[in-house]
UniProtKB/Swiss-Prot annotation:
Residues 1-23 form the signal peptide. Belongs to the RxLR effector family. One of its GO terms (cellular component) is host cell. It comes from Phytophthora infestans (strain T30-4) (Potato late blight agent). This is RxLR effector protein CRE8. Effector that is involved in host plant infection. Contributes to virulence during the early infection stage, by inhibiting plant defense responses induced by both PAMP-triggered immunity (PTI) and effector-triggered immunity (ETI). A motif (RxLR-dEER) lies at residues 54-69.
């Protein structure tokens, strides 16, 4: 709550308190609450906005933990991944080889896993089995045999995981 709204509540409560018909213990409680909120607002007025997440986590912050930095890392990872899918090339990933920021690489890996799971879910929805997946990948010359097998193994793991989730 902001201080001006607290002051308005306190002033209106004081106004009601002095009326003959509306004076009640409830008005006293509202006045006490408004004044205490106003006092807390004034006491905490020197606290900066940056300290709010720290307050919510009880002051327990890991070294180097910064919310803005995490958001920037996620945005950088999303940008690289979008470039990969728009250009249909892995050349934007070359930027990641040069970076020493492990968090960005982890975010990219997590986003790639999510994207691949969505693609596998679509393939499963249209009834594609692992043999069909392998046949489709053999038709594409930009994959090596090792990449084809790795993709099919990952697809099989996805199908097994999906079956286990359906049984549970």
């Amino acid at each position: 709550m902001r201080l001006p709204s607290i002051l308005v509540v306190a002033a209106s409560t004081l106004f009601l308190h002095y009326g003959y018909t509306s004076a009640s213990p409830g008005a006293d409680a509202v006045l006490t609450g408004a004044v205490s909120l106003g006092f807390l607002q004034l006491v905490g007025a020197d606290q900066s906005v940056i300290e709010q997440p720290r307050f919510l986590r009880d002051g327990k912050i890991a070294e180097g933990d910064n919310e803005e930095r995490v958001n920037a890392q996620k945005e950088a990872a999303a940008k690289v991944l979008d470039q990969v899918f728009k250009t249909k090339s892995l050349s934007p990933l070359d930027k990641l080889e040069k970076t020493s920021n492990l968090a960005v690489i982890r975010h990219v890996a997590a986003m790639v896993d999510d994207k691949v799971d969505k693609i596998f879910a679509f393939a499963d929805a249209v009834g594609m089995g692992r043999a069909s997946m392998l046949k489709m990948l053999k038709g594409d010359k930009q994959f090596t045999d090792a990449e084809r097998l790795k993709t099919v193994k990952r697809y099989v793991k996805f199908l097994i995981k999906k079956e286990q989730n359906n049984k549970a």
